[in-house]
């Protein structure tokens, strides 16, 4: 898993642009500092930064308003990565809900942190 995370972020960072020898800075938008996603983003950045001399990528974690904020900020080009729940990724890609007037079909998932099954009670 550790190598998958480093490889995925490094590959995506290189795809963003810039020479491999130059230092590339990336940010991961997460959620509130008291939630689960902020420490998860911090752990990903620690893994990336541990081997930054090999790939030239420096990672920083940012506390944000969560999934919708992260998606919109990535779309605006202000974040390179963001943690988003899969239902909001679906809405962003397909255009319903908050994204009805402004879908984001270019959004891509790099990895899944954990499964999020849910129960619908009617």
List each model region and its residues.
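N-terminal signal peptide c-region/cleavage motif recognized by signal peptidases
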Residues: 17-19
């Amino acid at each position: 898993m550790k190598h998958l995370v480093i490889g995925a972020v490094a590959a995506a960072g290189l795809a963003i642009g810039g020479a491999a020898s130059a230092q590339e800075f990336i940010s991961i938008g997460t959620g509130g500092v008291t939630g689960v996603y902020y420490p998860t983003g911090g752990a990903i950045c620690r893994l990336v930064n541990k081997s930054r001399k090999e790939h030239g990528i420096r990672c920083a974690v940012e506390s944000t308003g969560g999934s919708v904020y992260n998606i919109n900020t990535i779309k605006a080009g202000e974040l390179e990565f963001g943690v988003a729940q899969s239902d909001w990724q679906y809405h962003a890609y397909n255009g319903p809900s908050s994204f009805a007037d402004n879908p984001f079909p270019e959004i891509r998932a790099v990895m899944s942190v954990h499964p999020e099954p849910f129960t619908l009670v009617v």
